Amino acid sequence: MSERDSPVGEHTKEPVNDGQEQEYEDAVAAADSDHDSDALSEVDEDQFEDYDPETANIEDRPVDIDEDVARTLKATKRKRTEGEAPKKPREGRRDKKRRDRDEDVEMDDAEDGSKKSRRSRRVAVDGERRQKSKAATPEPENEDHLSPEERRKRAIDRALDAAIKKPSGQKRKKKDEIDLEAEIDDLLADLKVRMEGACQSDNQAREAGQPALHKLKLLPEVTAIMNRNNVQHEVLDPDTNFLQHVKFFLEPLNDGSLPAYNIQRDIFNALAKMNIEKEALLSSGIGKVVVFYTRSKKPEPSIKRIAQRLLGEWSRPILNRTDDYKKRQIETRDYDYDAAKMAQRQKTNSQFSLSQRPAPNTKEAERERLLAPSRGNNSARMVNLPSSYTVAPQSTFMGSQGSGHRPLGAGGMEAFRKMTQKSKKRAN
């Protein structure tokens, strides 16, 4: 018999009521009653002997209201008492102070006008701007009745219209109405004059036996203007022709020595980041200097690698070649096996000596002997052949014409045939 089925186990699970909970509840009730009795014991009962609730003066007593009289009443303001002060009128929401760009322009006119005139002019400009913005932005249409696809199409159309109407290529100006493009042109013109003067000063210093330091001093300004993204168009403009003076910096000096390594490294790194077009290359002539650095043995290997990479990138647009491997045009030629075999046979016949070749006539043999080139003991050195193919080779292998050619699946068929033969032999 298990403990679950035994009556002893059932008796142990029941809660034991020893009277403690009842005693606790009685104690709590007695405490509450004592608290109430203590509060009432402080009240004097003699005060309430003559109390009559009907005659008592109670302010909160409900009053009977005549509905007909209440309908005739009108809404009026509550009368203020003698000591009550009137309330201040509530102020409306103040506008936030906005600082527009026009303030910078108006600062120049501070000497001519006063503060009041500036403030009135600013308010007028703000009013005109707000009116233009309100007129330019039409009210949005209600698109609740449209389907999600039509809403999406309208949103795309609005985005395209906004992109088309957005003004692009505006003339950049400063706050004081100075044209930035004209300033950049003046900066490049001044820098070109100083670069040319630095090259001439370095040549004169080398002729005098002194170190060439003028281009090194001007190098930070040159690299800074070449690495600025916002002036790339002006630097690469063929009319400005700034790259021609960069070529002067990279050219060897009059004594044949190359410019300093810092000049080569910084300028080549800056040229590698630029997207130079064909017109700029032709007008500046910087490609000739890059070709010189690829063929000369004086530059460092790192400079030579950058020059070779630049030469490959710049020669593609000139030679009308693309860097896309899929669009490459590979030169191929048809191979005539019979013609090649005939040419090989004629070549082998021409290599025979007079004694080995059958001479049909003595006159022809004498003529060939006189016309044969003289061979000395010192043979000429063989010219190195090109390491890559100029014409792509074509494979002439035909797998189906080979002696050991087997079609696809022939091995499986042969194995199946052997299995059937074995089964026939066993059956016999």
Curated annotation (Swiss-Prot):
Residues 244-321 form the TFIIS N-terminal domain. Residues 346-359 have a biased composition (Polar residues). It holds the Pfam family Med26. The keyword Transcription regulation applies. It comes from Gibberella zeae (strain ATCC MYA-4620 / CBS 123657 / FGSC 9075 / NRRL 31084 / PH-1) (Wheat head blight fungus). Belongs to the IWS1 family. Residues 1-151, 346-381, 393-412 are annotated as: Disordered. This is Transcription factor IWS1. It is found in: Nucleus. The keyword Transcription applies. Residues 1-16, 58-71, 81-94 have a biased composition (Basic and acidic residues). Gene3D superfamilies: Conserved domain common to transcription factors TFIIS, elongin A, CRSP70 (1.20.930.10). Keywords: Nucleus, Transcription, Transcription regulation. GO terms for biological process: poly(A)+ mRNA export from nucleus. Residues 39-53 have a biased composition (Acidic residues). Transmembrane segments: none annotated. InterPro entries: RNAPII_TF_IWS1 (IPR051037), TFIIS/LEDGF_dom_sf (IPR035441), TFIIS_N (IPR017923). Transcription factor involved in RNA polymerase II transcription regulation. May function in both SPT15/TBP post-recruitment and recruitment steps of transcription. GO terms for cellular component: nucleus.
